[in-house]
Amino acid sequence: MTRRAICFDLDGTLVDSLPDIIGGFRSAIAEQGLPVPGADEVRPWIGRPLLDMFAALAPEGDAEVLSAAYKRIYPQRFTQHTRPFDETVHVLEELRSRGYLLAVTTTKHSPMARDLVTALGLADLLDHVQGTDGFPAKPAPDVIERALSALDAEGTWMVGDTTHDVHAGAAAGLRTYAVCRPEATHDRATLASAHPDRLEESLLPLLDLV
């Protein structure tokens, strides 16, 4: 029997982590004495590689130095406000009960992603946590392909909250499910422009599709 897997982005999809990510990003910039962008300026960049984010939002600084500062600051606060979304545990438990393998496919590096899902009590509900470790980030499909290879499974859906997730899922040959929450990284119009197979306001409707 073919093993079936569903891939999930982490931040903004399974967990409400944007305040801690934005706070860490702004703190890293402030620490270097640079002009600090507002939260609304940072939000659309979440899910992109750190070097790209810092180059765009703190062009006066050294992106390598700022990235190193973020990697030091963020783990100290990454569960200060971060919590799973209300439906996350229920949806993951239900999908596992239906025989699906569940993977996180995130732009975070794998060790940080594993630390976060463990701290939030989600590790036992996930079969694999795949970060972006030295290969092209989403919208490239590499992180999804590596997760599916590790699971030796056929991918069915890619679930995420950004256009990068949608494009990566489509490039990997998966159906795509975009989540547009009130404080989403990308707004509904932006997500719709990527043409996901489904565009919903939470994870719950996914249960009617599998």
Q: Model regions: which residues?
A:
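Metal-dependent phosphoesterase signature
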Residues: 55-90
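Short acidic-hydrophobic, aromatic-tinged amphipathic segments that line or gate anion-handling sites
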Residues: 198-202
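Short, acidic loop-to-helix structural element flanking the phosphoryl-transfer center
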Residues: 76-104, 110-114, 141
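Acidic, Mg2+-coordinating phosphoryl-transfer loop and its flanking beta/alpha structural elements
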Residues: 158-197
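Helix-loop "lid/cap" segments that line or gate small-molecule binding pockets
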Residues: 28-29, 48-61, 116, 147-150
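Conserved phosphate-coupling serine/threonine residues in phosphotransfer and NTP-handling enzymes
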Residues: 13, 106-108, 180
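Conserved Lys-Pro-Asp/Glu-containing loop-to-beta segment of HAD-superfamily phosphomonoesterases
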Residues: 5, 138-166
